[in-house]
Each structure stands twice: as structure tokens, then as C-alpha cells.
Amino acid sequence: MPKLKTKSGAKKRFKVTATGKVMSAQRGKRHGMIKRTKKQIRQLRGTRVIFKTDGDNIKKYFLPNA
């Protein structure tokens, strides 16, 4: 069985923590920001932990070596 390669797009978008959780940037910051309040825009900064089931799928299919 050959080694599985990590998907390069996922490598740039996701980070796996030491405890195995998957982190990613907040969604919803590409367009349509004029409708949001300053507080809403500010709260979209930084990263977040992805739900466990989604994180498991990301690790299985896109980040097999993580």
C-alpha cells in the first residue's frame, strides 16, 4: 500500500493541535461585511476548533499523516 499524501489545500487551511483537535480560520469574512456590525467583524478574527466529526473526516481524508 503506498503512502497517502496530504492534500496541499488542507495543509494551508487546517492545523491539528497536540490533542488531535482541528483548528481553522473563521468563516464568513470574504464578502458581505457591510451588513455586519464592528463587533461581529471583530469576533470573526482568529481561529476556531472544528466540530469533532468534521475534524475526524478532515484528518482521515485530507491530513492522513497528521
Swiss-Prot record:
Keywords recorded for this protein, A-Z: Ribonucleoprotein, Ribosomal protein
Chain segments annotated as transmembrane: none
Gene3D superfamilies per record: 4.10.410.60
Molecular function (Gene Ontology), one example: structural constituent of ribosome
Any GO BP: translation
Disordered: annotated span: 20-41
GO cellular component: cytosolic large ribosomal subunit
Basic residues composition bias: residue spans: 27-41
Source domain of life: Bacteria
Entry's family note: Belongs to the bacterial ribosomal protein bL35 family.
Protein name: Large ribosomal subunit protein bL35
Species name: Rhodopseudomonas palustris (strain HaA2)
